[in-house]
Amino acid sequence: MDNVQDKVTNTKEMPKHPFPVVPTTKILAIGQFTKAPTPEQLKEIFPKEVPATLRLYLEGKIDQWWIRQTQTGPVFLLNVTSLEEARALMEQLPLGQAGLMKHEFIELGPLTPLHLLLTDGGGRNDNL
C-alpha cells in the first residue's frame, strides 16, 4: 500500500518470558480504514472486496473473520506463518490496493504456559 505503514506486533520484540519460544502458527490481521471511502469508492470497490475475501477463505488463507463492534474494519485470522505473506494477502485485496485499509498484524502461536505441564520427555510433570 502506498504511503500507508502497517503496524506489526512482532512477538520477537516482546519482553522475555520464562517459557520456550513457540512457532508462529497464525496471524491476526486487524484492519482499519485510512480514510472514509466515498460513496463512489464503495460502489466500485465493495463488489470486488467481498468475492476477493471469499476467495482467500476458500483457498484456506483466511480461517475466520469478524467485524469489530467499536470501529470500522475487519479482523482476519490468517492461516499463514509469516508477516510478509499476511501483509501481501491484505495488500492484494481491493481496499488495500486502493490505499483505504491499513492493518495491524499480530503473530500467534501455541499457548506457551502449557509447557509447564510437560517434562523434558514430553510426559506429565509430577512437580506441579
State where each predicted segment sits.
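Conserved, structured core segments of small domains
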Residues: D2-L128
